[in-house]
Amino acid sequence: MINSNTVRQFRHDIYSSFPKAKDALFNTVDALMSEPQATSLPEITQSLWFERQWSSVYEGLEDGRIDQSALRAVFWQYAPRPLPGHRLWIGIDVSGIARPFSVTSADRTALTVHNLPKGTKAITYGWHFSTMVVLDEQPSSHTFILDQQRVKSDTTAIQMAVAQIKQIESHLPARSIVVLDRGYDATWLWCQCSGLNVGVLGRLKQKRCFYRPAPPPSGKRGAPCKDGTLLQIGNPATYETPDGHACRKDGKGRAVEISWWRNLHVKDARWLSLSVIQVVRPHASNTERDPRVSWLVWLGDEQEDVTEIALGYALRFGQEHGYRFDKQRLLWNEPRLRTPEQFERWSQIVAIAHNHLLLARDLVEVQLRPWESKHRRMTLQQVRSGINKLLHQLGTPARPPKPRGKSKGRSVGAIVRKATRFPVVFKKPKVPQLVPS
């Protein structure tokens, strides 16, 4: 059980991870949490916890520094731990920050826009951010962020995901599972994760092909067969008889049919043994957002209960709820900051505020509005509405501002030049060659 001393120490550890402009940055964290009605970056400075002028929020993001290694260590120190007999579920996904008209912002790449009307161009430009979180026991925004990094133009989201897994892998408890969306359907990622002490559960695309073990040599002339019969996700004629089949109930008590095939491989990595899982939900509407049939790939211990693993994939959707909370409530994509480095610092501020609210949810006394149910679990937005009283009890490690008088301003005759323009980076980086980890 988390108490006020734990949250107070968390605040001091976060403060220590700011090497420069730490007071302004920490004031920004408190202001972001305690101003639930704000709709822009300047508006959060009207919080009582932002002790500086409103322009200092931009100065802090421009001049401040955040030690990402120290911040990751703090996040992992306070991350939720699984109960005895339970697993730790880790989610990794990428989210885009659209900046189509920010020509003075560097390193913008193409982003895919979802849920658009037919005929609309589904491409915009901006930055990608890769986020690694601890998933909640049920899909909700109560995710705990472990790491959040910008995907630069010279790398890919898949490479960033592998790097994030390797950074945290040595700290993970046994039987931990990393859950990935269909965008991470990549043989290279499976090869890189095969030597790690963590299971990987990913969703598959319809075009993915697998092969069963090769038959024994026939003794005839020529090279023996390297692959067995084909299993193509989009072709039911290739399924044959699965190695196992079970009927289970999901978290809402609805029937789910699970089938699996073991000891499969892909042509690019025949040495890598994979399990393919088919999940059929008869109650689904069978639309693009709610498919009736889903296919998963499992890379990990073959002795694990496949049905439990397959049902656990639904926890991944909690990360989508977390993204929605960060963007709609914590204003993650609202500030129009010029440089990617400034927006990286803002992204870390949002991650700190998100985790702080999660740690403080059991310590906050929330005044519910008449239409809000007291029988439901408290949301992070409701925690924000009652965080002020807790912040008074915890105090702040940030030092008060020192008045310095008025600035001298620009020197006489100074020339303000036009900001540098940067083109959109369209070059797609190449994934390294497949090598066993």
Named regions from a protein language model:
Residues M1-G64, S69-A70, F75:
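Gly/serine-rich nucleotide phosphate-binding loop at the start of the catalytic core
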